[in-house]
């Protein structure tokens, strides 16, 4: 590195010595935790261990340049950085290994994630944003390789937006856009598509991202030569290198064991990103992995003796220690004193954490033993109870699972009889207290989880009939005027106002920062949205067609959908995804993969408006709450006429509430989205045969029918028909499961439910292709007629085809 890239920070020698010794203390503490943590897992006290050994030095250097307001989007090697910032104590480190779920104990995920997955709270216990501009922030880690990349783009771009826009309350989230997103990733994960897509987008957008690539030459057992062209990711990225004439990405390569070189590299990287908003990749080479990849296996299996000897010599902590001694900054005895003190502290923290983990479980064991002793009296020393007491007394290294297995196994042997009433109550109470620890916060649970007041849509006298897309456009106009922190971006969103003109002219009115075009890169469009939402903005990320959501499904599923759950409600990303879908033309422009989305995206609302007025109401509602959601507009409905509301931007709806569109007494027809128009047409035809069908618009698949309209309808019709243009068993299967298990509709049915869906293959092209691939009015009408034929075959003769 040249002198022009050196840090401008000035310290006197004593301050410098103190800082170096603090750094060594941090590095040694982190390693001591890793060593003892691995031992605890191998002893069976934890299920899995993955640690940051070998990455301590670059992380403690990053810590010097990580400022309040900054964000990290990293992975399961970043423990040293969290320790250096005071977010991860030695005790908390072991709480994670032991998966302690006691409230308020394990700070990262409340015991839901394996150790090594870190985060800091972004909201308080009431759901209000913390002052993020004054805090050092860490977005929640996740295990899938490179899954942390897409959101880096949005976290970094948020700084650019806060710098360009003067937003009310902007100081709560940003210091004039001076924040860096610090990204971290392992070398092998750079082979993933998310990595390259993010680097490309960062270079295009010019955002303050500093991405560290920790390169230890391996991806578990696979060497770099089998992972990356030329065996070096920085060589592969040379085409992205910025020049004096062209914007791009600054690429720095530095050895991970060289303390002074790391300081120079990160000083330069931080200054470039923070002041000029230029993305920087820091390729940290010659990293080692002293403990191997994880507790799942030993790296001695695949590394040569020569490689292992080199790793031992170039362990960054050892090199750092040797450098300190060579520079005369500390003596051997001084460093040994630091090491001995840390080893003692870490051992004590481990012991304390283990005792804290076991205490409530031991208490539950004593309670169960007392219950069993009462049960043995009630059953006259029944041998099954005696055996259960013996097994319970001999338990060693157990959790709640083993206690419940003993208790539940015993009560089943008595056919859940009265002898076990007290024991069954104990089981019930324990499950009730424990279930929320493992199953809460899939969705937002604070006062921002639902709109406060429902406002009906209103119309002026003689309100005009307009294309549906005009209703949507003018409603977006009202929303952008009301919400200065609202942004929308996606393919063709800006200049032409989206492919269906729902944003026509709005870029000219509100600017290219708020109404923005993007490249064809669905995964990072979602990543932009997640990152912006984490930083307090209100983004709408547009995926041009529903079929293209599949490009981003991994990011949506693993990151956005699980965010509230995996942080126990401490982080939220109220991203709105706008897309359009269902029937149009061709295999990839008329898909409706709702079943896949419903299974993969629990944690995200999935809203399915039948027209553009309903879509507008959904956007209006979503901006009043803090729940991520996908709104699927009806692709073939933009040119259909709708009445123009006169309270644009204000009317809303209870999300998840279904609506009865047509009353009837003979059967209940349930559907959503574009298909509803066909269902209504079929219901009209049925009426001509004196069959009165009740038509219900679900409006939302997640949440589903929160007002129980379907059960109320079935109480009078006793027949259920679900019409869906997904594949057989797709959304229709999900809807039926929800109704049978959650709403207990089975006793209301006099006939078997009828599911009408699309064919199992992709929809064929053309009008005839649509007719034979998706449910038609004829299909729906005939399926309903057949239900009535079963009831009254004399009045409704059988269809002969």
Where are these regions (language model features)?
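Short beta-strand segments
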Residues: 74-76, 146, 184-185, 211-215, ...
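Non-catalytic terminal/interface segments that mediate subunit docking, oligomerization
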Residues: 382-528, 533-535, 547
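Helix-enriched interaction subdomains in cytosolic or periplasmic regions
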Residues: 129-139, 420-457, 600-606, 613-646
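Cofactor-binding active-site loop characterized by glycine-rich and histidine/acidic residues
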Residues: 35-212, 217-219, 223-241, 246, ...
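Thiamine diphosphate
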Residues: 56, 137-397, 402-403, 487, 635-801, ...
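N-terminal amphipathic, basic-rich helices that act as targeting or association modules
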Residues: 1-89, 462-471, 475-483, 492, ...
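Active-site phosphate/pyrophosphate-binding segments
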Residues: 571, 581-585, 589, 594, ...
């Amino acid at each position: 590195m040249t002198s022009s890239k050196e840090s401008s920070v000035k310290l006197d020698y004593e301050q410098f010595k103190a800082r170096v010794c603090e750094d060594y203390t941090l590095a040694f503490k982190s390693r001591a935790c890793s060593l003892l943590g691995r031992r605890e897992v191998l002893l069976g006290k934890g299920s899995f261990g993955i640690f940051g050994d070998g990455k301590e030095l670059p992380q403690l250097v990053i810590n010097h340049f990580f400022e309040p307001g900054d964000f990290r989007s990293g992975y399961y090697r970043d423990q040293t950085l969290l320790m250096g910032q005071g977010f991860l104590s030695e005790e908390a480190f072991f709480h994670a290994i032991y998966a302690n779920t006691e409230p308020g104990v394990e700070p990262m995920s409340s015991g839901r994630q394996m150790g090594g997955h870190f985060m800091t709270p972004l909201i308080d216990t009431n759901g209000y944003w913390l002052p993020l501009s004054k805090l050092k922030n860490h977005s929640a880690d996740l295990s899938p390789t490179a899954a942390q990349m897409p959101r880096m783009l949005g976290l970094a771009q948020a700084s650019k937006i806060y710098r360009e826009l003067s937003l009310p309350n902007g100081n709560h989230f940003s210091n004039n856009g001076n924040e860096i997103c610090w990204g971290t990733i392992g070398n092998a994960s750079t082979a993933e598509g998310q990595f390259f897509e993010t680097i490309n987008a960062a270079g295009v957008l010019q955002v303050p991202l500093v991405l560290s690539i920790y390169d230890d030459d391996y991806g578990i057992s696979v060497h770099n030569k089998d992972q990356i062209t030329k065996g070096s990711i920085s060589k592969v990225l040379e085409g992205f290198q910025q020049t004096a004439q062209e914007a791009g990405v600054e690429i720095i390569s530095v050895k991970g064991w060289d303390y002074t070189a790391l300081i120079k590299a990160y000083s330069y990287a931080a200054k470039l990103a923070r002041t000029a908003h230029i993305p920087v990749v820091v390729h940290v080479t010659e990293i080692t992995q002293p403990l191997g990849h994880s507790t799942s296996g030993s790296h001695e299996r695949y590394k040569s003796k020569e490689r292992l000897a080199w790793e031992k010599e170039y362990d960054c902590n050892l090199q750092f220690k040797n450098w300190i001694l060579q520079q005369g900054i500390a003596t051997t005895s001084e460093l040994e004193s630091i090491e001995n003190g840390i080893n003692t502290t870490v051992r004590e923290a481990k012991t304390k954490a283990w005792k804290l983990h076991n205490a409530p479980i031991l208490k539950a064991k004593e309670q169960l033993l007392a219950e069993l002793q009462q049960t043995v009296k009630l059953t006259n020393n029944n041998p099954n109870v005696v055996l259960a007491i013996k097994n319970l007394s001999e338990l060693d290294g157990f959790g709640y699972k083993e206690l419940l297995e003993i208790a539940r196994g015993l009560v089943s042997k008595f056919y859940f009889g009265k002898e076990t009433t007290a024991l069954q109550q104990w089981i019930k109470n324990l499950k009730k207290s424990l279930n929320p620890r493992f199953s809460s916060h899939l969705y937002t649970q604070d006062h921002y989880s639902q709109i406060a007041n429902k406002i009906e849509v209103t119309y002026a006298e003689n309100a005009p009939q307009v294309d549906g897309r005009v209703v949507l456009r003018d409603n977006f106009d009202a929303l952008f005027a009301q919400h200065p922190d609202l942004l929308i971006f996606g393919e063709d969103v800006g200049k032409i106002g989206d492919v269906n003109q729902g944003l026509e002219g709005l870029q000219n009115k509100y600017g290219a920062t708020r109404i923005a075009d993007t490249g064809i890169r669905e995964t990072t469009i979602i990543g932009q949205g997640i990152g912006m939402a984490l930083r307090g903005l209100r983004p709408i990320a547009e995926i041009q067609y529903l079929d293209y959501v599949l490009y981003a499904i991994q990011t949506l599923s693993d990151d956005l959908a699980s965010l509230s759950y995996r942080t126990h409600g401490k982080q939220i990303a109220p991203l709105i995804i706008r897309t359009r879908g269902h029937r149009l033309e061709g295999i990839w422009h008329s898909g409706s993969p709702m079943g896949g989305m419903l299974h993969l995206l629990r944690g995200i609302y999935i809203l399915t408006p039948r027209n553009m007025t309903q879509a507008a109401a959904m956007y209006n509602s979503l901006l009043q709450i803090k729940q991520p959601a996908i709104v699927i507009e009806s692709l073939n409905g933009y040119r259909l006429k709708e009445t123009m509301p006169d309270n644009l931007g204000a009317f809303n709806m209870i999300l998840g509430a279904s609506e009865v569109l047509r009353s009837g007494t003979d059967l209940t027809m349930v559907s959503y989205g574009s298909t509803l128009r066909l269902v209504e047409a079929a219901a009209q035809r049925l009426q001509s045969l004196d069959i009165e069908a009740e038509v219900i618009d679900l409006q939302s698949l997640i949440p589903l029918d929160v007002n129980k309209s379907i059960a109320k309808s079935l109480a009078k019709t006793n027949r259920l028909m679900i019409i869906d243009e997904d594949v057989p068993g797709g959304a229709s299967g999900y809807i039926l499961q929800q109704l049978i298990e959650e709403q207990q509709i089975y006793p209301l049915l006099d006939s078997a439910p009828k599911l009408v869906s699309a064919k199992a293959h992709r929809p064929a092209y053309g009008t005839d292709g649509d007719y034979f691939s998706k449910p038609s009015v004829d299909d729906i009408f005939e399926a309903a007629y057949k239900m009535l034929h079963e009831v009254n075959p004399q009045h409704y003769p059988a269809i002969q085809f």
